[in-house]
Amino acid sequence: MMTISKALPNFFEYAEHQTSYALRDVILPKDLSLLVKWMHQPHIIPQWQLNKPELELAVYFERMLCDDHQHLYIVQIDGKDVGYLEIYEAKRDRLALYYDAKKDDLGWHVLLSEDAVGQGHFRAVMRMLSFLIFEHSNAEKVVGEPDQTMSVYEKIRADIALEPQGTIQLQEKTAMLYHCYREKFYQQCGHYYKTFKRKKADKCLVEN
């Protein structure tokens, strides 16, 4: 039986402001060297705590790929691999111990590599992952639980329809629980996706 997360597409494309974004499935062992490199970058270590030897990470990501409550993606910007994304089913995740998770709720963990950080892409990447979820599932709510010290989410939440729900104490961190509701997200950000789809359709007409 196909689970909610595994039913998400293997590839999803998006664009904003003449920049192309995409999500593609993680492929092992092809992507292992990239994942090892990213997990050892200084800005990623404190949040992910996966700065482990390559063999340990190979086993870790194999297990992650076999876990049917989540879907692993590589984030691409203009065709370049620049980040990692996990989409997970909140009801079947430990997060369900900390809030009243609904069956269709989907959550995320995301990172951008050091060469993509600070380049003005994070809002678009966050909108892309929400469009992926809302366009290809029945989720009425997307959830996130970043470390409360990650101030970037507070800075951009108004631009991506994130609503803070308060802090929760996980084993390894104090997290800020965020909800992103489908209706509000499309009211606020839907025009981005409409613009992308229109430009894509126009391009197809020209090419044909």
Swiss-Prot record:
Free-text function comment from the UniProt entry: N-acetyltransferase involved in the biosynthesis of fimsbactin A, the major siderophore produced by A.baumannii. Catalyzes the acetylation of N-hydroxyputrescine to form N(1)-acetyl-N(1)-hydroxyputrescine (ahPutr).
Keyword Metal-binding among UniProt keywords: no
Enzyme class, first EC level, given as a word: transferase
Catalytic activity: N-hydroxyputrescine + acetyl-CoA = N(1)-acetyl-N(1)-hydroxyputrescine + CoA
Encoding gene, per UniProt annotation: fbsK
GO process annotations (BP): siderophore biosynthetic process
Cross-referenced SMART domains: AlcB
EC code(s) of this entry: 2.3.1.316
Name of protein: N-hydroxyputrescine acetyltransferase
Organism domain of life: Bacteria
Family: Belongs to the IucB family.
Functional pathway: Siderophore biosynthesis
This protein's UniProt keywords: Acyltransferase, Transferase
Molecular function terms, GO-annotated: N-acyltransferase activity
